[in-house]
Design a protein with these regions (language model features):
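Multi-pass membrane proteins that catalyze or facilitate reactions on polyprenyl-/lipid-phosphate substrates
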Residues: 1-69, 80-304, 308-441
Length: 441
């Protein structure tokens, strides 16, 4: 995660008009490349350093809160900042505009990926993207592992998670739950390992970051507020998903898409990479898409603005396109993609609007921090499973080594790890290399 300095003498935040903030949120939706680290860095530079709309402590506290939640932390952070500046409507506008540009871009790319894949140049381009994706996932294992695995016990969490998901086929939500319980148990024996603040070895206590700053008077934390927010979001979920259920029936692909991605939205701890194998497992087993198509979708999501979790929209589009029922594939695909995106991000708004008033209490909860330390370590094993799974599919198809894919993955990994080459540039380079290899050599 991007390191952000604390500033002790920062000037007081200045008021900002809704119109001025709206212009920034529109702009952010089109420039939010670079994954969550890049997106969070852009927001910090713009809203804290350059524009001084919120203070450093407020930004850091909001970021810590969003990192505790399932779902894309950068989109949730934008929602929080919008809420902090202009209340509920500010949060809705900020969170929505963060993803709207990528919705249309991914919709177009998803269509090209299935409707025109029989064109040799298009097929070759997608072939070239796949080894880049393998390298991206391997780099994610290295990056997340470096940050999360600070002790041999945490390495044990990662290894057990890999064994459970790769060999024993334990569902991802169960791994999250078991890792959280393990974190709570191990905190009693090794509190210094499961402390996310500063551990005092004399008192054997974990000292969390000072949380004394006020968050203003937007919304007071209360159970009534949480219940109201939950009921509103529940109605907003029931209306479209229920309508599809009544129209198409429970077993229809569109209904299953709505139900599955609702469940997935609540287990995306550790970012999009952590839940990808869960989504890919279900999607491939359900006949929604093939493994090469899943790899293509991840590559497209990496190279477009917006959160990486937008790969779910691609899966929803292809699932409905491939099993459209009596609808046309295009109509079914658009409906599937739209429903997927809606149920993926609706919980994000609920988490922010219901939880932001409780942010100080949550940030200092040591048991919660210990549970999340266990989950974060387990996520490394889950992402490693994804790397192994993708690697075999791409590098050793049909039990024979693919020289182009092996070379492409190796070169891509070198560029990512050694030279920090931007992913959104590397994916198009891979596409061009695939075209050259397939059509010109």
């Amino acid at each position: 995660m991007t390191q952000i300095k604390n500033s002790t003498l920062a000037p007081s935040p200045k008021p900002v008009s809704f119109k001025e903030a709206l212009k920034f949120w529109i702009k952010l939706g089109f420039i939010s490349f670079g994954g969550p680290a890049g997106q969070i860095a852009i927001m910090h530079q713009e809203v804290v350093e350059r524009r001084n709309w919120i203070g450093e402590n407020q930004f850091l506290r909001a970021l810590n809160f969003c990192m505790l939640l399932p779902g894309p932390e950068a989109q949730q952070l934008a929602t929080y900042i919008g809420w902090r500046l202009h209340g509920t409507w500010g949060g809705i506008v900020a969170g929505s505009l963060f993803v709207i540009p990528s919705i249309f871009v991914m919709m177009l790319l998803s269509y090209l990926a299935v409707a025109h894949v029989d064109i040799p140049a298009v097929a070759a381009a997608f072939y070239g993207i796949q080894p880049v994706v393998v390298a991206v996932v391997i780099e994610a294992v290295l990056r997340i592992g470096k940050k999360a695995l600070k002790h041999r016990v945490l390495y044990g969490f990662a290894v057990l998670a890999f064994v459970c998901i790769y060999f024993l086929k334990v569902p991802f939500p169960a791994i999250v739950a078991l890792a959280a319980i393990g974190g709570l148990i191990m905190k009693q024996m090794l509190p210094q390992v499961f402390c996310r603040g500063q551990f005092d070895f004399n008192t054997r206590e974990c000292r969390m970051e000072d949380q004394s700053d006020s968050f203003g008077n937007l919304t007071r934390p209360s159970v009534a507020h949480v219940i109201r927010t939950f009921l509103v979001c529940l109605v907003l979920w029931v209306v479209p998903v229920g309508a599809v259920w009544l129209w198409r029936g429970y077993s229809d692909t569109l209904t299953q898409i709505g139900l599955f991605f609702t469940k997935a939205a609540f287990v995306t701890f550790g970012g999009a990479y952590a839940v990808l194998s869960y989504i890919a497992d279900f999607g491939v087993a359900s006949g929604w898409l093939s493994m090469p198509q899943m790899l293509t979708g991840l590559g497209l999501a990496e190279s477009t603005p917006g959160p990486l979790i937008m790969v779910t929209q691609y899966v929803g589009f292809l699932g409905a396109w491939n099993i459209p029922g009596e609808l046309s594939p295009l109509c079914a695909g658009v409906l599937g993609a739209s429903l997927t995106t809606y149920v993926t991000f609706l919980p994000c708004f609920f988490f922010i609007f219901a939880g932001a008033p409780f942010i100080e209490a949550m940030a200092g909860n040591q048991r919660l921090q210990a549970a999340l330390t266990g989950v974060t370590a387990a996520v490394v094993g889950v992402v490693l499973n994804l790397a192994v799974w993708f690697g075999f599919k791409v590098l050793v198809p049909d039990n024979s080594v693919d020289i182009f894919s092996l070379s492409g993955a190796g070169i891509s990994l070198l560029l990512l790890v050694k030279f920090h080459f931007p992913i959104h540039f590397l994916v198009p380079v891979g596409a061009v290399a695939g075209v050259v290899w397939k059509l010109l050599l």
